[in-house]
Design a protein with these regions (language model features):
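Phosphate- and other anionic-substrate recognition elements at nucleic-acid/protein interfaces
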Residues: 2-4, 11-140
Length: 140
């Protein structure tokens, strides 16, 4: 069984998370400029057996797609072209950034560190992926 990589896509920065090979626990992987994500994933996939990607689906409160969805669809097209052997799933990422920010606040991390968007991106990607894993395990 291979790992699953979670992707919290952003216009400027993208957070990445990964699972253990048994696909039970999600862990933070990286936060990168979005322009570097595909290159990073190509290198990562040479080192680690990745079987699927979960890309966050940013929905509005009323369930309609967020404005960034067009960019995400373009990115998914690139992801499919580069990793045709991997499955790509979408998962609702509503509130992951707010939960990540609250987690940072409650963890006692200093304000200066909480302002580091890369930490927030990684936590959001991890929350997205863990939520997906929990959903998937409840479906069995």
């Amino acid at each position: 069984m291979g790992c699953i990589v979670g992707i919290d896509y952003g216009s400027k920065r993208t957070g990445l998370a990964t699972t253990d090979p048994q696909q039970i626990i999600a862990s933070s992987l990286a936060s990168l400029p979005t322009t570097e994500v595909l290159s990073y994933l190509k290198t990562y996939c040479k080192e680690v057996n990745v079987e699927a990607f979960v890309v966050g689906q940013p929905l509005q409160k009323d369930g309609t797609p967020s404005a960034i969805e067009t960019e995400i669809q373009h990115f998914i097209g690139q992801l499919k072209a580069a990793f045709s052997e991997c499955a790509i799933a979408r998962y609702d990422e509503r509130y992951t950034s707010k939960i990540a920010a609250q987690t940072l606040l409650e963890s006692g991390i200093k304000k200066k560190q909480r302002r580091d968007k890369s930490i927030l991106d990684r936590i959001s990607a991890t929350l997205l992926l863990q939520s997906y894993l929990d959903f998937k395990s409840n479906m069995l």
